[in-house]
């Protein structure tokens, strides 16, 4: 999904990278716990988070994420903005709650990492299976 499409769907404000909205993301990851992000995110992903400090940008950079959408109207601090400029990570902000933002993107075709992983399992190691 193009970042411009993400911007339109979530009615985002562009904070960093308005010249890179033609870039593509291949999946989404919504989390506030950066250890979860590091465990589950894949390169070229879109990170949705309410964590608005520099750690969100550091984590996205380490994980190879292309962009961050800050949810719930959160805005990153100056240090996070500067690091995003240095690393080339696009920063967007939306008023939507994380659940709503992820749902809107999913409804428009963006998928999460678990759908792209073979044999994805929970913490206990047993494969997740639908009971429906």
Residue ranges with predicted function:
Residues 1-19:
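N-terminal, charge-rich interaction modules
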Residues 115-132:
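Internal, active-site/partner-interface "lid" segment
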Residues 22-23, 27-46, 50-120:
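Feature captures the catalytic cores and cofactor-binding loops of soluble hydro-lyases/lyases
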Residues 3-4, 85-89, 132:
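Catalytic, metal-anchored helix/loop core of enzyme active sites in primary metabolism
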